[in-house]
Amino acid sequence: MAKWRCKICGYIYDEDEGDPDNGISPGTKFEDLPDDWVCPLCGAPKSEFERIE
């Protein structure tokens, strides 16, 4: 699964881990995150994330 980096603060969203503190189950693909999901560290929207290898 992919990892996505916040271009603002560097937070890594790992699809394997999800974001359990914010109700996102492990295995949730980035494109399947709710539209109102934001970076848990800085509050940046999904549009500020880039896929990394």
Curated annotation (Swiss-Prot):
Sequence ranges assigned to domain Rubredoxin-like in this UniProt record: 1-52
Pfam annotation, one family: Rubredoxin
Cofactor binding note of this UniProt entry: Binds 1 Fe(3+) ion per subunit.
Cofactor(s) required, per the database record: Fe(3+)
CDD domains: rubredoxin
Keywords: Electron transport, Iron, Metal-binding, Transport
Keyword Protein biosynthesis assigned: no
GO biological process, one term: alkane catabolic process
GO molecular function, one term: iron ion binding
Spans through the membrane: none
Positions annotated to bind Fe cation: C6, C9, C39, C42
Role noted for this protein: Rubredoxin is a small nonheme, iron protein lacking acid-labile sulfide. Its single Fe, chelated to 4 Cys, functions as an electron acceptor and may also stabilize the conformation of the molecule.
PANTHER family referenced in this protein's UniProt entry, alphabetically: RUBREDOXIN (PTHR47627), RUBREDOXIN-1-RELATED (PTHR47627:SF1)
Annotated family: Belongs to the rubredoxin family.
Protein name per UniProt: Rubredoxin
Organism: Pyrococcus abyssi (strain GE5 / Orsay)
Lineage: Archaea, Methanobacteriati, Methanobacteriota, Thermococci, Thermococcales
Protein's gene: rub
